[in-house]
Amino acid sequence: YRSLYGLQGIKTMLRGTLRNDGFCAAWDVLVQLGCTDDTYPMEGVESMTHRSFLNAFTGYHAARKLEEKISSQLGLAADGPELARLKWSGLFEDTPVGLNEGTPAQVLEHILNKKWKLEPNDKDMIIMWHRFRYAKDGRGNEIQATLVAKGDDSTRTAMAKTVGLPLGIAARLILEG
């Protein structure tokens, strides 16, 4: 970003991304539990529900609900944003997973795609705002840049245009020399 915004002389630069409240922390819960592991096939996937999938990572406890076990295991508030996001994603539902086999990561992806999938006429949008505050020659300065990208439909999405397409172009250029 330094050269892109003409900030080559800046000694220290920090970059961060803000997402919806609780999103990153909720994803971290899934990582800590082991739900994103793609190195081994799970057993019994064909009979799993969303809830039993998540329960597979918490250990058996006859008297405690899944939500309580996750809260206790990871030191989370029972009414915190992490569990609220997991609940919104449908992970505590007794809905059948709908796969015959898969790794934890594949099962999780399948569950989340049911909730996050765009319908044929849906469109996505990416809004980015960069603000750089820096000191140069003893004076405070600021540069701002924005990007708004709109998807055309559920296939030609803003995400595909801004992430997938540039990556595909780069790969093709590398392959073509």
Q: For each predicted feature, which ranges?
A:
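C-terminal catalytic/substrate-binding lobe primarily of soluble NAD(P)-dependent oxidoreductases
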Residues: 1-177
